[in-house]
Amino acid sequence: MRSLTLAALLLCSLLLVFHTSAAAELEAQEGHLMIPGDTDTALETVDDERFFECTFECDIKKEGKPCKPKGCKCKDKDNKDHKKCSGGWRCKLKLCLKF
């Protein structure tokens, strides 16, 4: 039992050393570590706005279909009231979700 515990500790130590050295190498190559929130802030804001817009304006009847505004039964796409939630938004689980 002791040998199994010792082997597990040794393996974890090696993985930690490998991970640390790989991170240091990437930092040296890039000059800095990339922080995910830095570049996605503008896109995240647009996605949040689109999510709320779609959630409140959509009449969800069929799963997987494009989200459509409530009360719009016309097929005239030139009508300004006939908006679609575009950009990958679909009705799933009674919500408009981006895919």
Curated annotation (Swiss-Prot):
<keyword id="KW-0800">Toxin</keyword>
<comment type="similarity">
    <text>Belongs to the neurotoxin 12 (Hwtx-2) family. 04 (lasiotoxin) subfamily.</text>
</comment>
<protein>
    <recommendedName>
        <fullName>U1-theraphotoxin-Lsp1a</fullName>
    </recommendedName>
</protein>
<dbReference type="InterPro" id="IPR012625">
    <property type="entry name" value="Hwtx-2-like"/>
</dbReference>
<feature type="propeptide">
    <location>
        <begin position="24"/>
        <end position="50"/>
    </location>
</feature>
<feature type="signal peptide">
    <location>
        <begin position="1"/>
        <end position="23"/>
    </location>
</feature>
<keyword id="KW-1015">Disulfide bond</keyword>
<feature type="disulfide bond">
    <location>
        <begin position="85"/>
        <end position="96"/>
    </location>
</feature>
<keyword id="KW-0732">Signal</keyword>
<dbReference type="Pfam" id="PF08089">
    <property type="entry name" value="Toxin_20"/>
</dbReference>
<dbReference type="GO" id="GO:0090729">
    <property type="term" value="F:toxin activity"/>
</dbReference>
<feature type="disulfide bond">
    <location>
        <begin position="72"/>
        <end position="74"/>
    </location>
</feature>
<keyword id="KW-0528">Neurotoxin</keyword>
<keyword id="KW-0964">Secreted</keyword>
<dbReference type="GO" id="GO:0005576">
    <property type="term" value="C:extracellular region"/>
</dbReference>
<comment type="function">
    <text>Toxin that causes irreversible contractile paralysis into adult Aedes aegypti resulting in 100% mortality after 24 hours.</text>
</comment>
<feature type="disulfide bond">
    <location>
        <begin position="58"/>
        <end position="91"/>
    </location>
</feature>
<feature type="disulfide bond">
    <location>
        <begin position="54"/>
        <end position="67"/>
    </location>
</feature>
